[in-house]
């Protein structure tokens, strides 16, 4: 029989991060709508793709929970949907906090409490969250430098209408 997480700090951390990932998913879905309305189809698609990834992160966390009521105290971004540029900055900041502070700490706690699989999950998701931050910051740079729709030289891009993996120049 596996060790129970009931009553541990790891259980609270799982619920905290599950709530955070779930809320990030919804924020990114809202942000995708703003980006689309502002004419940033690619950024909208990236927000949607990342929202789907956050859903999967939340699902992995939820599967470790064992049921019942768990009381947590946590803070989350509340109710602000800005421009695409503002949303990208906010999303990057949230991703940064997850991969650089929260999840490494949660992994260490899980390890100390005897939950190596949960620790590994947090470390693996941290890698994805760092990639999310980097991608969002690249789009911030593109908007600030007005290179979203204009690049120097030839650019290879993936067509979103063609079969998967089809690239165009």
Indicate residue ranges for each PLM-predicted region.
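Non-heme di-metal
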Residues: 1-168
């Amino acid at each position: 029989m596996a060790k129970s997480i009931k009553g541990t700090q790891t259980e609270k951390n799982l619920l905290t991060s599950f709530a955070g990932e779930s809320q990030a998913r919804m924020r990114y879905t809202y942000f995708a709508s703003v980006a689309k309305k502002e004419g940033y189809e690619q950024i909208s698609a990236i927000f949607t793709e990342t929202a789907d990834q956050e859903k999967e992160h939340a699902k992995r966390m939820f599967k470790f929970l064992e049921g019942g009521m768990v009381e947590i105290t946590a803070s989350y971004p509340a109710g602000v949907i800005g421009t695409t540029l503002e949303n990208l900055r906010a999303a990057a900041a949230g991703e940064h906090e997850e991969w650089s502070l929260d999840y490494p700490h949660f992994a260490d706690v899980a390890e100390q409490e005897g939950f190596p699989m949960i620790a590994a999950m947090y470390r693996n998701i941290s890698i994805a969250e760092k990639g999310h931050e980097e991608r969002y910051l690249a789009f911030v740079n593109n908007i600030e430098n007005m290179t979203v729709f204009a690049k120097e030289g030839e650019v290879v891009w993936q067509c979103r209408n063609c079969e998967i993996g089809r690239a165009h120049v």
